[in-house]
């Protein structure tokens, strides 16, 4: 990352969560009429009236009338496009200039004797709609009234022309597949109120039908296109080709399906074809397909464009696409899309002619095994919350947004459920105004969805949930403080009990606290068991195993914080009922354990109990004289002995010697600073030692100081595959070289390499691009053992 971007991000981060409240006179409005400036209204203007009347009445019980006639009395909201004339002599004295860009608007509030007049004026019908959305976010809501600062005046325009989210009605989703058309309408409306102008569906998919579908996928996708038409939003489709394009029959069926979708869709503005993820066809086959798709698309939707991502294309394939675009300048192409496993945005923007736009496809939905994993996430959260848990991370995703801002013309996010709702709103608001403060964004979110009584505290609570995931879980005492805050909010605001966004925050606060308590408790149990195992030659092997198991099983027989556990189960049920969130495969028919099934992992051991149980079965089959030795080895697994050190390299709680690279605040994209990885074995229920599922490809370095320069040291490593280890920049030769999971490698360190008691371990890189990432080499644990 260049210095300009780094400085920009740092300056931005300094302002995060900073909020300055200005004291302003507020108008309390208990009657409202909406007046239109045009006799014939566009879809955007009709939608503006609809969202104002319905959302105000929903929150307050106050009904707004609407007409084209300016009333003689009462409070008024004027909605008009620039150039529309109103039959009124009222003039605003505090109007800011309207920015003459698409979707721009201005809002002003003035008092006229005993009434308040609010103006929403847009450069176009979308500007009117987004102005209405902004006003709804600015209102404070009370019973039968709304309030607004009397001197309010603003004028604004969007930074990015593309601002949207993918909402796929498919089995893979953790909630969308359970929705009715009315729920899609409401959620799309809410995204639009915060500035989204695009919605992307997934009408072609190769997976089983969801048990939650209320209507057929074709019918739902048709309805989503109609909803976009009603709100005057762009409608996009994500249409991967999960087939071999050399197969003419399959190719023709794909094109036939695509034409059917084009025919039934009320509108289509963009068609996004991913080069890969999923799909595995070279661009030489993809581009001719896109040319045919463009002909079909233009027949039904003449103003629509095709978009292509280079996901999973290698360097030569990407260059093929760049060259094709430069030479052919296809008129059917809207631009390229940058997503997971794509070339960097900077490269693609530089290679793409300026007439074509570059759209980002950010993954806002996943926590691990993704493009933007939670930085140095404590493994206790990985093993329980997993890949698709509720994940408000406004600060982190704001930093990512700012790192990409200069390259992109907008975004439509990847999302597979409502669990990433805060992240969606964050990116939407930043794409409207890159300088928007995170504190203000979370306050608007809280005010609109929870109400003015909790605006400040709930906004703080959302930011606190993000802080819960920072650093070692045991040392993060703020997790308990976050729980106390949300428990207080829940107690004092029972009226929000059925609000699904509220329920999500409560679930995360309770789940985080429960995981922390379990981790501390179960870690202590394992430490007690290890003491007994380390003394197996004194205690006796059978007795040591029996005593260790009794201690370890207290996690089940004497559960910690059972009330918290029951609360989590209760909130999971509430979320299934309120919004269809599927937190369990067995109970709620989630499509898979990796898809947000957090309830299924509520009791997953956070110590090595399962591994120890299996090891005891193995050890009991050994000759009696070998059993005690094997148990001692297990009991001392993480004990490097006097003068030694142990690190589980990807575990933030057990990696004090591991160099962590630059903070996400400086380098949010984590390019070249690959963080920890978490292997997904046996659908999350692997009984292997936990440290073997926590890895780094190659740690940036493992650094030791204060060593005995006269002593002989040995480096011990577990991991998988190869290990090209260097000590103080000199390659070490192994004396033991186990390549399997959990197998030991050992490297003697020549005394001459330890200078001034310092030792830095690093790894030479190894090109394994020909292997699936699951088969690539990696490091799990590193010991530095002082040979006595």
Language model features with spans:
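Composition- and surface-driven signal marking solvent-exposed, interaction-prone regions
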Residues: 2-4, 48-49, 134, 179, ...
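Acidic, contiguous N-terminal accessory segments
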Residues: 4-6, 11-15, 21-113, 145-153
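Structural motif
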Residues: 36-40, 78-84, 121-123, 169, ...
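Feature activates predominantly on carbohydrate-active enzymes
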Residues: 42, 48-51, 55-57, 95-251, ...
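Catalytic-core regions of glycoside hydrolase
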Residues: 142-144, 197, 209-225, 229-230, ...
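C-terminal non-catalytic alpha-helical accessory regions
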Residues: 415-423, 435-637
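Glycan-recognition and processing domains
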Residues: 625-707, 772-788
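Beta-strand-rich ligand-recognition modules
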Residues: 691-710, 718-787
